[in-house]
C-alpha cells in the first residue's frame, strides 16, 4: 500500500515543466536572461522523480554569478525540483555537448 501511494505521488520534472513554463520564462527575463533551453535527462525524457532540471540561459551583459544563483533559487522554488542554470557564454567541451542536446524551454 505504501509503495503504491509513493509511486502515485512521484512526479518527474518533465511533467511539471510544461505547466510552469510561462512563469519560468518570466522569471528568467526578469533576471536578464533569454533563450532558455533544457538539457540533460529532462530534455531526453529520461528523468525520474528526484531528477534535477538543467538549463542553459543567455544572460544580458552586466549580469554575474550572483544573478545566476538567484535565478537558480527562484526556479527551484517554482518547480519544487533542484534547478541548475548554466550561462550560455560558458566554454568547454561539456558546454558544447550540452548546447547540442538542449531544447527550448
Locate the predicted segments by residue.
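Catalytic core of pol beta-like nucleotidyltransferases
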Residues: 1-35, 43-48, 59-105
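Amphipathic, hydrophobic secondary-structure cores in small proteins
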Residues: 53-58
Amino acid at each position: 500500500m505504501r509503495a503504491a501511494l509513493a509511486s502515485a505521488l512521484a512526479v518527474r520534472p518533465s511533467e511539471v515543466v510544461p505547466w510552469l513554463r510561462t512563469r519560468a520564462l518570466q522569471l528568467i527575463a526578469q533576471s536578464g536572461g533569454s533563450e532558455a533551453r533544457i538539457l540533460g535527462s529532462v530534455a531526453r525524457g529520461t528523468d525520474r522523480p528526484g531528477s534535477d532540471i538543467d538549463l542553459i540561459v543567455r544572460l544580458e551583459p552586466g549580469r554575474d554569478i550572483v544573478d545566476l544563483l538567484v535565478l537558480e533559487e527562484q526556479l527551484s522554488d517554482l518547480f519544487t525540483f533542484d534547478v541548475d542554470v548554466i550561462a550560455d557564454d560558458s566554454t568547454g567541451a561539456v558546454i558544447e555537448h550540452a548546447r547540442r542536446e538542449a531544447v527550448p524551454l
